[in-house]
Amino acid sequence: MEERKQKKPSSAMETTTLTRVPESERRPWWRLAFIWAGSVICIPALMVGSMVMAGMDFKQSCLCMVIGYVIVVFYMCLMGIQSSDLGLPCTVAISRAYGVRGSSFLVSLVIAISNIGWFGSQTALCATSFCNIMSGYLHIDFPLWLSCIIWGSLMFITSVYGVKLIDFLNRVSVPALFIMLIWGVIAALMRGAAAAVTVYQPPMVLGWTYGITLAVAGFASGAVTCGDYTRYGKNRKDTILSCVVGVLPAGIGALVIGGFLAVAMGNFDLSVVFSSFGFPIIGMLVLILATWTTNTGNAYISGIAICNMFKLKDGRRPVVTLIAGAAGTALALLGIADVFAGFLNIIAALVPAVAGVAIADYWIMGKGRADLWEPFEGVNWIGVVSWLAGAAVAKWGTFFVPTLMGIVVAIVVYCLGALIIKNEKINPIYAMNLKLTQTAEKE
């Protein structure tokens, strides 16, 4: 009797969500690098560049941007390697650091809210800019509500299909965005931008800490949840390459170009600059591609976080992602995204501190060994308390770069707690060391 061969699904829909990514589905580093490049080239990144430039000269600004992104990529690599080691997304990979319930009900909730909120904010920005270009340069009065629905839907539908379509989108869009970014700079230089940048003096003098803080904040949350993509990495080397090559050139480039355009042309938004040059269609392409490649990640990550909250089966991710994207679009449509900004600032302090606990748990106390890792049932209160301590420093701290200090505080508090508390029921690190000791004695 002949064995029937199982047909592989022809759909591009992603099928792995909370379970381990099989080796057969792992991807080369350069494909993940394209996803990262697409994530950091966005209109908000250009805006951050202009904000850094508002407080220091061009050379100082560029140096702050480089330092900020090097810091982000350093802890991004640590978070990313853990997920590639385990083959699990961020919210599952930290289920020892926070406990299974702590990861599900606390961290996943914060990550879901954060990314849905940013999806709504970016959709609103894209929709508004699109309408402005249509009316200002093409003399077409396009309804804002329709613009929100069209662009929001396009972005979250891409996320519904998962990493396969996101990968394809970025491989097509990133080269085009690089060409348009370079073209925009050259066009500005031909209009005398170099002279404006050379003689530029910032309207107010702000310290190095200010510039580095802004640069770090631009991708601080994205670096924490990078495991949702790096779980597809083949090994540690590939994960590091994807993060370094994907983020540093594109991320720093976007910040520098944003600052350059703000000084030279009076506007950081490259889409508006192109439109002012008489190329409104190119301006719209920059706007749409830059927002699309970034916003797909917001919906995708929130979908995975919600699946982890309710422990849904892998096959439910597409529906959950669709709902998350629709919720973000509704925020943009109802104009709540701007009102939501204050709440998002609090969430933004909570998300980076997640990395501190995860790094302390896996790399310092867990020795960076995947074979020693296992989820901890219930809530790991050592992790939760450390996270809140780090988040408080990130939100209200004033020393150096508060976001970075929040991560450091979370690391220190977790390590101290893991060393001091000697109870295997509430301390997974103590339980791990106890098992190692017992195994060594048996041998």
Regions found by a protein language model. Name each.
Residues M51-I81, G102-L106, V247-L248, M405, ...:
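Extracellular loop-to-transmembrane helix junctions
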Residues W36, S108-L109, S135-Y161, P175-G184, ...:
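Transmembrane alpha-helical segments of multi-pass small-molecule transport proteins
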Residues W29-A45, I186-R191, Y200-L261, F277-T296, ...:
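Hydrophobic, membrane-embedded alpha-helices of multi-pass small-molecule transporters
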Residues S159, P175-Q201, V216-F219, G258-V263, ...:
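Hydrophobic alpha-helical segments and their helix-loop junctions in multi-pass secondary transporters
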Residues V66-Y98, V107-G117, S121, I421-N427:
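Juxtamembrane transmembrane-helix boundary signature
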Residues V354-E443:
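C-terminal membrane-solvent junction of multi-pass transporters and transport-like membrane proteins
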Residues M1-K59, V72, L206-I212, R231-L241, ...:
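Membrane-interface "cap" regions at the ends of multi-pass membrane proteins
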Residues A127, L146, I150-A188, Y200-P203, ...:
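Membrane-interface loop-to-helix entry segments
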